[in-house]
Regions:
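Accessory, usually C-terminal, subdomains that scaffold auxiliary metal cofactors
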Residues: 179, 189-248
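Short, glycine/charge-rich beta-strand/loop segments that flank catalytic centers
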Residues: 91-109, 120-122
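Active-site rim helix/loop that mediates acceptor-substrate recognition in acyltransferases
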Residues: 27-45, 186-205
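Short, extreme N-terminal leader segments that mark the start of a protein/domain
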Residues: 1-21
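Conserved donor-binding loop and adjoining core beta-sheet/short helix segment
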Residues: 17, 28-99, 212-239
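Acyltransferase donor/substrate-recognition loop-hinge adjacent to the catalytic core
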Residues: 111-183
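Residues that form generic nucleotide/phosphate-binding pockets
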Residues: 18-21, 81, 85, 106, ...
Length: 248
């Protein structure tokens, strides 16, 4: 039987080794998403058969992530354990945000399978080289914005952010709040969650950076490396500085 524990800040270091090598290339397969959005996803975790098993509760319906294997993990065995757990509880196994490469394996396990393709849940996936160079006509708009920003902000630089930059970050959030125009509860909640995730830089789980100009941060970002994919959890910038978002 699986024994689930709610995701907390203290549990992130337990989850991180699995996500660190996760090849699925989906933002939901990251410790940052599970923690930042724990209030919405109600994520819980368990370990079985050398795999991390995540159970979310979305709109009151328990839904599993696809198992994330560790070095000696057996995904097929973990799926069987999930099936047995659901059978004992009298519920059908539901998996959400299944990697495309693994969906066919699930379809072959059961005589009846329903697969739903939710376009709104799809991630944006970019090649690192594309974002490094913005080459070609497709990225001409981004290049123009970046050139404008660099012209108007000579000396601006991208710097890594750690707990040593706490004062810079605190000043940035004050500046950002002054420009923040969104009044919806969802937008305000997302901002609070972003600030909270930045407060955990001391855990060494994330990579953060920002654009510094004349002693002030104009933009910040926080990401998490999962396998060969850098999952960007947060991007915030001061709208009053045109071109700063593409530059970030």
């Amino acid at each position: 039987m699986l024994h689930f524990t709610p995701v907390t800040a203290e549990s992130m270091p337990l989850l991180r080794p699995y996500y660190e090598t996760c090849p699925y290339r989906l933002c939901e397969y990251s410790s940052g998403v599970k923690y930042m959005w724990r209030g919405h996803l109600r994520s819980e975790y368990a370990f079985t058969d050398g795999c991390l098993v995540i159970r979310n509760c979305i709109d009151g319906v328990p839904q599993f992530d696809y198992p994330i294997p560790g070095p000696e993990g057996d995904v097929d065995a973990a799926l069987t354990t999930i099936e047995d757990d659901c059978r004992r509880k009298g519920v059908r196994p539901i998996f959400s945000v299944v990697p495309e490469s693994e969906a066919g394996k699930l379809a072959l396990r059961w005589p009846r399978v329903t697969i739903t393709n939710e376009r709104a849940w799809k991630d944006y996936l970019y090649h690192a080289e594309d974002l490094a160079h913005f080459a070609g006509r497709h990225y001409s708009g981004q290049r123009n914005h970046i050139n404008k920003f660099n012209k108007e902000h000579p000396g601006a630089e991208f710097i890594p952010l750690t707990v040593e930059n706490a004062d810079l970050l605190a000043a940035f959030w004050v500046d950002y709040q002054q420009e923040f125009q969104k009044q919806s509860p969802e937008a305000k909640r997302e901002l609070a969650l972003a600030q909270e995730l930045f407060s955990h830089l001391d855990m060494g789980l994330f990579r953060a950076g920002g654009i510094l100009w004349e002693g002030r941060l104009l933009a910040v970002a926080l990401a998490e490396k999962c396998g060969e994919t850098l999952v960007c959890h947060i991007e915030k910038a001061l709208y009053s500085h045109a071109g700063v978002y593409p530059c970030l």
